[in-house]
């Protein structure tokens, strides 16, 4: 890790653009997207399972949130989250009750979730009409964070607390 910081410092040498608040903000935005997905995969790997359905769930939850959240973004986000919970619950019950491999069950889940997304969208790109939601979620605060990255950090903190005290 120290070596990587030294190399990055040499790359930045005097320009001042690489090690900047803007770069940290950009990295945090990327973390806000990929961090929770990686956390879910990592937690499943801790219990010697592997969840291949994550990418299918991300696309389905996003589509559900966009398709149902035009009038009320909170409702869309809640329904997208609920879809993820229901999907995970179904796959978890199948694995535990039928004693099946997580790879097989979640691969089937991935294909099923992608199929549902395909049907919901008609294989078309869906867009969200209200850009003020995106602007609000991505607006910087404290020069380093956005609402999205703060939520991702909170999810990591919650996972750490659950792992520590359960």
Q: Residue locations for each model-derived region?
A:
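Generic alpha-helical transmembrane segments of integral inner-membrane proteins
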Residues: 2-10, 36-40, 60, 78-90, ...
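Hydrophobic alpha-helical transmembrane segments
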Residues: 27, 35, 56-57, 74-82, ...
């Amino acid at each position: 890790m120290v070596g990587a910081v030294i190399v990055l410092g040499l790359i930045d040498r005097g320009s001042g653009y690489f090690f900047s608040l803007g770069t940290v903000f950009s990295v945090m935005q990327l973390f806000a997207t990929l961090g929770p997905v990686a956390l879910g995969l990592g937690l499943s790997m801790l219990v010697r399972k592997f969840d291949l359905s994550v990418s299918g769930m991300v696309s389905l939850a996003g589509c559900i949130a966009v398709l149902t959240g035009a009038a009320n973004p909170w409702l869309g986000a809640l329904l997208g989250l609920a879809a993820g919970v229901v999907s995970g619950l179904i796959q978890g019950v199948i694995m535990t009750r039928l004693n099946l491999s997580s790879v097989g069950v979640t691969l089937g889940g991935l294909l099923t979730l992608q199929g549902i997304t395909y049907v919901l969208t008609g294989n078309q790109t869906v867009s969200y009409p209200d850009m003020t939601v995106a602007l609000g979620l991505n607006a910087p605060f404290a020069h380093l964070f956005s609402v999205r990255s703060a939520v991702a950090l909170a999810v990591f903190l919650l996972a750490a607390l659950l792992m520590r005290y359960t």
